[in-house]
Amino acid sequence: LIRRTIVVEQQLAFPEAIHQSEDALFNMQMLEYVKSVDFLHETLTTYRVWGMSSFQRFHADLPQQMEQVNQQFLTFGKVHHKGDFYWNAYEVWLMETYIRLLKRYFYHPNNPQSEAEKKRAWKALLTTCPSLKQLRRASWKKMYQSRKSYPLLLFFLLYCRCYALNRRVMEWLLRTDRY
C-alpha cells in the first residue's frame, strides 16, 4: 500500500493508474474493517485526501476504470465469502463512487460532450454497466436508514429505478404492439 504521507513529503509523482489503484486499496481496506455503513461514509468524506484522487480530473475512460475496480471488489467479496457488513458497505461505496462519477465525468467543466451527448452516455451507462444493475436492486429501506441526510443518493436510486421501469414499460408496449 502506498502511504500518502510519503508521497506528499517526497513530492513523488505517480501515473493515474497508481492513483486509481490507491483509491481502490484504501476503500478495500475500509470495507474490510468497517462495522457500520455510516462510519464508512464518515471516513471516506472526513479522512480522505481528495487532492490525490484521480476523480478530481476529467478522463474519457473514467467509467471503464471504475467498472474494473468495482468488478475487483465483487470478485474479492465472493472469493473471500464476505458477510453482510461488507456487502452493505460495498453498496453504499458503489453509490458514492457513481455520484462522484456523475459530478466528475458527466458534469465536469472540461467535458467536451454536449448536454444531449451527456444524457445519452448516462442512459447508456445505466443500461450496460453491471455494477449499476446491482444498485438498482438495492433496498430502499436500507438506503434510507444508512443515508437519511443524503438526498442525492435517493435521487440517484430513484433515477435508476424510474429509467429501468420506463424501459420495461416501453419493451412491453413494443412487444404487445400497443405503441
Q: Where in the sequence are the language-model features?
A:
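Short amphipathic alpha-helical patches
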Residues: M30-V34, S54-R57, E96-R100, S149, ...
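Conserved nucleotide-sugar donor-binding catalytic segment
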Residues: L1-A60
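All-alpha amphipathic helical-bundle segments outside canonical DNA-binding/catalytic cores
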Residues: G83-V92
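Catalytic-loop motifs flanking and including active-site residues across diverse enzymes
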Residues: F26, V69, L94
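Catalytic core of nucleotide-sugar-dependent glycosyltransferases
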Residues: E42-W50, Q56-D84, T97-R104, H108-L132
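Gram-positive cell-envelope targeting signals
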Residues: F39-L40, M52-Q56, P63, V69-N70, ...
